[in-house]
């Protein structure tokens, strides 16, 4: 039995040409789709890069603030330790003035600034797949910087309960030995945390500066200076000037 293939209406040459046109059209459509997808990822990367730059610039300023007040916090710890060691059972209230915007009902005897240390832009970049479309070295640099931010935030969270634990020293009282030892232990931990956070902040500043971020340098410098001025008004001349060069 013989089978005869149906012949195209206009011949095989015309049919082949029509098929070629269809295939070419499909390839063009696929290529255009890939171009659109690449362009979209390019836009997503640019947006993510700017969001991370803005967040890192803010974190670097917060780090500079911690470096600026490191000596103030260290001196305050030393004052309280010396007073506790010299205590003969009677404690004289030694509260700090309330910082701007404070809403505590109890006086504080020690206080570091509470900052956000946000990593939202980095978390978003990881979850959306944007990092897969960036160079490995750049991603590694961002990862290191945001890792420092997360570490500083964790250490800051350790400071808060220790600060609260010392609030009782803001009132005059008869101080028993157990309370005195407990306060000294808390101050020892705060001393370590202060040095650690300041060291990590200094490292963060260097990492951020090496990224050569595209940010509003003038606005960032003004914001940092405002923070330092506020700290100096609150803590005095122990606050040193620190700059971040983007």
Tell me the role of every PLM-derived stretch.
Residues 1-13, 37-246:
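Long, hydrophobic alpha-helical segments that serve as membrane-spanning/inserting helices
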Residues 18-32:
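Hydrophobic membrane-insertion alpha-helices, especially the h-region
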């Amino acid at each position: 039995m013989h089978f005869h293939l149906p012949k195209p209406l206009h011949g095989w040459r015309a049919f082949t040409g029509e098929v070629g046109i269809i295939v070419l059209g499909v390839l063009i459509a696929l290529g255009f789709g890939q171009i659109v997808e690449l362009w979209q990822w390019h836009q997503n990367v640019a947006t993510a890069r700017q969001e991370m730059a803005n967040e890192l610039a803010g974190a670097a300023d917060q780090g500079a603030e911690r470096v600026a007040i490191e000596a103030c916090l260290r001196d305050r710890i030393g004052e309280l330790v010396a007073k506790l060691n010299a205590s003969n059972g009677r404690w004289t209230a030694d509260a700090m003035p309330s910082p701007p915007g404070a809403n505590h009902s109890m006086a504080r005897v020690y206080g570091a600034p509470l900052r956000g240390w946000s990593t939202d832009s980095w978390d978003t970049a990881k979850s959306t797949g944007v990092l897969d479309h960036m160079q490995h070295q750049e991603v590694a640099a961002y990862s290191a910087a945001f890792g420092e931010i997360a570490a500083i935030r964790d250490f800051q969270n350790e400071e808060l309960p220790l600060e609260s634990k010392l609030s009782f020293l803001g009132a005059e009282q008869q101080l028993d030995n157990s309370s005195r030892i407990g306060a000294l232990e808390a101050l020892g931990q705060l001393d370590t945390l202060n040095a650690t956070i300041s060291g990590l902040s200094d490292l963060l500043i260097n990492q951020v500066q090496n990224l050569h971020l595209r940010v509003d340098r003038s606005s960032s410098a003004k914001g940092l200076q405002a923070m330092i001025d506020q700290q100096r008004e609150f803590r005095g001349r122990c606050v040193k000037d620190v700059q971040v060069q983007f």
